[in-house]
Amino acid sequence: MEPWLRIWDTSTGQCLRTLVHEDNPPITSVCFAPNGRYVLAFSLDSCLRLWDYVSGTVKKTYSGHKNQGFSIGGCFGSVDGEPFIAAPSEDGEIVLWDVKNKEVVQRISGHQGVCFWVDVYEDIMVSAGQDGKIRVYKHHNPEAAKGINGVAAVNEALGDLMVTDLPLKSEDIKKEIIDLPLKSNDIKIEA
């Protein structure tokens, strides 16, 4: 793990920019914001940094999860048009932040041991953990979730770093009873 991000031009293979934070924390994973202008970096100092890679500056820093020894990664999502950042934590939780004000809006008990990864698609969130399970979460209000387009909502919100003023509530997302055990012999790859 290195303490910098490199932005590459995939058509030429050229490094366009190297981004380094003054604290130099090792970076474990990154993801693009859906609008393509920002990069969210997960680092071993228990912080997420939202980089504007064009200007080379950190626009926001999010703290409130634990990440000091594992490569973990999360994503952007949207509920009822409200964009958020979802990140796993070494204490097994999933932490959700309001993109604009950087506040933790929800903590979800996810896994026994480290939660390694979180991803969101429309009104569904999945997580994978050290306990060998993939957990699936679904927005509890299907009518409100109808037509959610996380890409469009986050794209629109991150364009000028704005989100709606409605906070996420703990009852907005509930755990569905779906725990999928992971075993190496469950995964078959065909050549």
Model-derived features: positions:
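Conserved strand-to-loop turn within each blade of WD40 beta-propeller repeats
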Residues: 1-2, 42-45, 87-91, 128-131
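Solenoidal tandem-repeat scaffolds enriched in leucines and small polar residues
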Residues: 1-19
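Short loop/turn segments that connect beta-strands within beta-propeller blades
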Residues: 10-13, 53-55, 99-102, 140
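A short beta-strand motif characteristic of beta-propeller blades
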Residues: 14-20, 57-64, 103-107
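Loop/turn segments within WD40 beta-propeller blades
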Residues: 31-37, 42, 75-82, 88, ...
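A beta-strand-loop signature enriched in Asp, Gly, Thr, and Trp
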Residues: 33, 44-75
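Terminal intrinsically disordered, low-complexity extensions flanking WD-repeat/beta-propeller proteins
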Residues: 64-72, 81-83, 90-95, 100-191
